[in-house]
Curated annotation (Swiss-Prot):
Source species of the chain: Mus musculus
Extracellular side: 172-173
Keywords: Cell membrane, Cytoplasm, Membrane, Phosphoprotein, Transmembrane, Transmembrane helix
Coiled coil: none
Oxidoreductase recorded as keyword: no
GO BP annotation list: cellular response to insulin stimulus; endosome to plasma membrane protein transport; establishment of localization in cell; glucose import in response to insulin stimulus; protein localization to plasma membrane; vesicle fusion to plasma membrane
Effect of loss of the gene: Mutant adipocytes show reduced glucose uptake in response to an insulin stimulus. Knockout animals placed on high-fat diet along with wild-type littermates exhibit an increased weight gain, significant elevated blood insulin and glucose levelswith insulin resistance.
Residue spans, topological domain Cytoplasmic: 1-102, 124-150
Inducers of expression: Target gene of PPARG, expression is induced upon PPARG activation. Expression is inhibited by TNF.
Any single GO CC term annotated in Swiss-Prot or TrEMBL for this entry: endomembrane system
InterPro entries: CD225/Dispanin, CD225/Dispanin_fam
Bias kind Pro residues: ranges: 1-10
Protein name: Trafficking regulator of GLUT4 1
Family that this chain belongs to: Belongs to the CD225/Dispanin family.
Length: 173
């Protein structure tokens, strides 16, 4: 049943006529800062197609027709609409992938502290999977923890070997 207090839902292929002029006004105000002639694209005057996407936003806008090249002095609307995703993508590409210290974790598995040596190996693998998922901060944190635990268990293993050799050769037979 439809609730009379709520406005009726629109078809995904239609937009209200009030939305397009408001959007055009906003874009005009942004682009008029340089006081240059505007070349508004046909995507604002034409109908907009809304398409369901699989992300957190419920819809994405796909314009009909070709996009016209923007003026060289004014920023393009395409880049201004997608500035946050472009900045995020370029920022993620500029950062180098954090180290996961997998080789160090595998090397620590050869020390005599055997069951505990699996812990840095697990953290190293978790760090590698975090990089693949795009969580660079989590991958960096897990990589540092894997490095710390690997070095700790290697030192502990060396101490155990020194104690075992010392006890073995100092005890009279």
């Amino acid at each position: 049943m439809a609730n009379p207090a709520q406005p009726p839902l629109q078809d995904p292929g239609s937009t209200s006529p009030l939305e397009l002029p408001e959007m055009e006004k906003l874009l005009t105000k942004v682009e008029n800062k340089d006081d240059q002639a505007l070349n508004l694209s046909k995507s604002l005057s034409g109908a907009l197609d809304l398409e369901q996407n699989g992300h957190s936003l419920p819809f994405k806008v796909i314009s009909e027709g070709h996009r016209q090249p923007s003026l060289s002095g004014s920023p393009s609307r395409v880049s201004s609409r997608r500035a946050s995703s472009v900045i995020t993508t370029s920022y993620a590409q500029d950062q180098e992938a954090p180290k996961d210290y997998l080789v160090l974790a595998i090397a620590s598995c050869f020390c005599p502290v055997w069951p505990l040596n699996l812990i840095p190996l697990i953290f190293s693998i978790m760090s590698r999977s975090s990089v693949q998922q795009g969580d660079l901060d989590g991958a960096r944190r897990l990589g540092r923890l894997a490095r710390l635990l690997s070095i700790t268990f290697i030192i502990l293993g060396i101490v155990i070997i020194i104690v075992a050799v010392t006890v073995n050769f100092t005890v009279p037979k």
